[in-house]
Amino acid sequence: MPGQTVSDLVDAAAPALEIRALGKRFGAKVAVDAISLVIPTGSCYGLVGPNGAGKTTTLSMATGLLRPDAGQALISGIDVWQHPTEAKQLVGVLADGVKLFDRLTGEQLIRYHGLLAGLDADTVASRCSDLLAMLDLTGAGTTLVVDYSAGMTKKIALACALVHAPRLLVLDEPFESVDPVSAA
């Protein structure tokens, strides 16, 4: 809505994520069939199921990466498809299989994501430094992402999802390619 900020649209009493009858077909294949789910703020949920069950498709629709054929997704009460810009400001997404700008260094990539999220340069610099340290990537911050291992790439993608301090964090296959010590 013109003149409104994200804060104006957020419903503090709303769940962190609400999915209402989301559905998606790929041709004749039903990938997701009217799934509904309410995830309260402050909670941690996992979607578990066999390969091809629709977990990634569901998360992609819920976070605005894939348009559903039916249903609705709300982040803190904001409809992902009616107010996509505002909703996406509230969520950090570690998507499975999404390519990164791997010709940037890890530090440059995190800074890029922070600036895209509308953070000022000083805040981005501080958060970038903190995230590199937290994820044990300080020494790799000046290395091109293309030269990272699969596990390091996953960690730098997580840093990009966290840089703007989102209200909701959605992780798809977060431990794939990550060493057991980092996963713990």
Residue ranges of model-derived segments:
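Conserved ABC ATPase "signature" region
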Residues: 111, 115, 122-140
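Hydrophobic anchor residue at the start of the ABC signature
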Residues: 158
